[in-house]
């Protein structure tokens, strides 16, 4: 399973102490949630159903707790749906198999985001979304096995730079280009 793979990687290979917070199958107390988040050096938000995750986070006030942890310097990583929350909005599956729709995020990063950009249908949907959006819009798209490291001042790519894209509008034309700032991946 996804969690077993995560544990194998972080506990066995990287020798990290790992705690898993599940709000759907477990019923952690407010104290347990606060303690887990407060004691973490790194918080990893996994992928999955974005709307379900967002609902669960609000119910347990995880959105507020994660934003506070970020402000206090905790490193927070996200994959797919776990990355989408940080952006103004993202493109995601409609979960009915008929297409892609926009979902709002927390707006910490004032750009639109597309994970799994290597999937042709998702790529085309993201292009259409950006082109049809009113006003000045900027976007970021990442193919699988590529990460974006965000600080207050910069964006840096971890992985292959040809898998990371940035978008902006110029004279009503969508411009797509690769990021030019890269960190060498040690994974």
Where are these regions (language model features)?
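General beta-strand structural signal in soluble alpha/beta enzymes
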Residues: 20-22, 44-45, 77-79, 139-141
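Short, active-site-adjacent cap segments at secondary-structure transitions
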Residues: 50-51, 83-85, 147-149
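Catalytic-core regions built around general acid/base machinery
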Residues: 35-39, 60-73
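Catalytic nucleophile loop
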Residues: 44-47, 70-89
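Glycine/threonine-rich flexible loop motifs
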Residues: 50-60
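Short amphipathic alpha-helical segments and helix-helix/interface helices
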Residues: 7, 33-34, 63-67, 126-130
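N-terminal beta1-alpha1 cap of cysteine-dependent amidohydrolase-like domains
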Residues: 1-42, 46, 175, 183-187
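C-terminal and late-domain segments of enzyme folds
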Residues: 1-12, 90-92, 96-187
């Amino acid at each position: 399973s996804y969690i077993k793979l995560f544990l194998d990687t972080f506990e066995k290979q990287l020798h990290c102490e790992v705690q898993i917070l599940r709000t759907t199958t477990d019923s952690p107390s407010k104290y347990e949630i606060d303690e887990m988040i407060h004691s973490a050096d790194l918080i990893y938000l996994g992928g999955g159903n974005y709307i379900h995750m967002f609902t669960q986070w609000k119910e347990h006030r995880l959105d507020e707790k994660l934003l506070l942890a970020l402000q206090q310097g905790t490193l927070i990583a996200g994959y797919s749906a776990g990355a989408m929350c940080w952006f103004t909005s993202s493109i995601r599956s409609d979960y009915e198999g008929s297409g892609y729709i926009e979902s709002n995020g927390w707006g910490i990063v004032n750009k639109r985001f597309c994970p799994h950009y290597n999937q042709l249908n998702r790529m085309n949907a993201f292009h259409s979304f950006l082109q049809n959006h009113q006003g000045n819009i900027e976007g970021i798209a990442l193919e699988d096995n590529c990460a974006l490291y965000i600080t207050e001042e910069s964006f840096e790519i971890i992985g292959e730079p040809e898998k990371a894209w940035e978008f902006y509008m110029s004279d009503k034309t969508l411009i797509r280009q690769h990021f030019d700032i890269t960190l060498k991946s040690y994974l």
